[in-house]
Amino acid sequence: ADEVNKEVNSWVEEQTNGLITDLLPPNSASPLTDLIFANALFFNGRWDSQFNPSLTKESDFHLLDGTKVRVPFMTGAHEDSLDVYEGFKVLNLPYREGREDSRGFSMQIYLPDEKDGLPSMLESLASTRGFLKDNKVLPSQKAGVKELKIPRFKFAFDFEALKALKVLGLKVPLSTIIHKSCIEVDEVGSKAAAAAALRSCGGCYFPPKKYDFVADHPFLFIVKEYISGLVLFLGHVMDPSKH
């Protein structure tokens, strides 16, 4: 069983360029295990317009409980797309990857106007059908970016997904589904990976108006292929000081 664990984890580590090293926890395979399915997704995206590392400075990030942490913030004069909605703004950071084969990848950062506004923003988005795939379902105003500050962040998340699938009404002939995701965002771009094991027993025009986009409080991020609307990674940053 230990050899099975090592073999699966070694394969996942190789496929995700070392971002995920321990998908299967110890003793997850046993003599009663008949079958293990494993898949992995790795995304390494370079910003179309990279941040200058020499401009990265430490600043305060405000947590939901009212406390603050000091973290490195990337900054720069990017001519990026900004959509202004009631109560929040969405910054679109395109990647270079995919331009040559008629695809387009980007990271969208959803920043609530209020420092403690993430829960209410998530509730509003969850109640708006199809918004994450097509942002045009809500009225917005196009704008430019005046001051841009985004924290560097890196974190991993894992959970047992079988219960969630059962809640959705899916009948899965498996005893366990382990899902783990990892993402790292810095001045060059972002590296993201996701893995799962299943065990059975261009240029834009901006209006003159510009807004600051200072992500110094909890926000939502999405990595997507924006031509099809396919969401590759989704998460929220609560405390960028924690890895």
Regions found by a protein language model. Name each.
Residues 92-94, 208-243:
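Feature captures eukaryotic membrane-trafficking machinery centered on endolysosomal pathways
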